[in-house]
């Protein structure tokens, strides 16, 4: 959908370095995310509870009492998708094929890949998607 709006070639190499994820309990939220995505969380204290997603992206979980839920989308490999989906099923999280259908228990195949949506304990909508196969 969004890809159709982008030019074929992007003239710059831009990566997202970090973003702040609001949570009622930053440590619990960081642990949830790290456990579900198969990442490590090292609680060294400090203002943020950081989870390093890859070599360029860190999610900085931060305590907040009042926040709107956000949508975070992650492009993952097929193997990563399978492993995370297995952990979603093991933990009993509901999931769905679209942001408007978060509990239908189905995956989508938009753009030739696989996708799934689910909510974290803070109400943020998380999306996993794979490349076309």
Q: Which residue stretches match the model-derived regions?
A:
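Core segments of cupin and vicinal oxygen chelate
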Residues: 13-14, 20-65
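Vicinal oxygen chelate
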Residues: 74-121, 125, 132-133
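Residue-level detector of conserved, well-ordered beta-strand and adjacent loop positions
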Residues: 52, 62, 119, 129-130
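N-terminal beta-strand motif that seeds the catalytic metal site of vicinal oxygen chelate
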Residues: 2-27, 72, 132-133
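Short, charged/polar surface micro-motifs in flexible loops or helix N-caps
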Residues: 56-58, 66-68, 77-82
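Acetyl-CoA-dependent GNAT
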Residues: 44, 63, 102, 130-133
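Short aromatic/hydrophobic contact patches that present stacked aromatics
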Residues: 18-20, 50, 71-73, 115-117
């Amino acid at each position: 959908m969004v890809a159709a709006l982008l030019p074929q070639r992007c003239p710059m190499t831009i990566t997202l370095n970090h973003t702040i994820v609001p949570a009622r309990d930053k440590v619990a939220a960081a642990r949830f995310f790290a456990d579900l995505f198969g990442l490590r969380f090292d609680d060294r204290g400090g203002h943020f509870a950081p989870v390093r997603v890859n070599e360029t992206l860190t999610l900085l979980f931060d305590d907040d009492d009042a926040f709107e839920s956000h949508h975070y989308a992650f492009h993952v490999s097929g193997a990563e998708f399978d492993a995370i989906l297995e952990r979603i099923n093991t933990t009993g999280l509901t999931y769905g094929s679209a942001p408007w259908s978060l509990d239908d228990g189905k995956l989508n195949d938009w753009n030739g890949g696989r996708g799934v949506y689910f909510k974290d304990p803070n109400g943020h909508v998380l999306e996993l998607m794979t490349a076309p196969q």
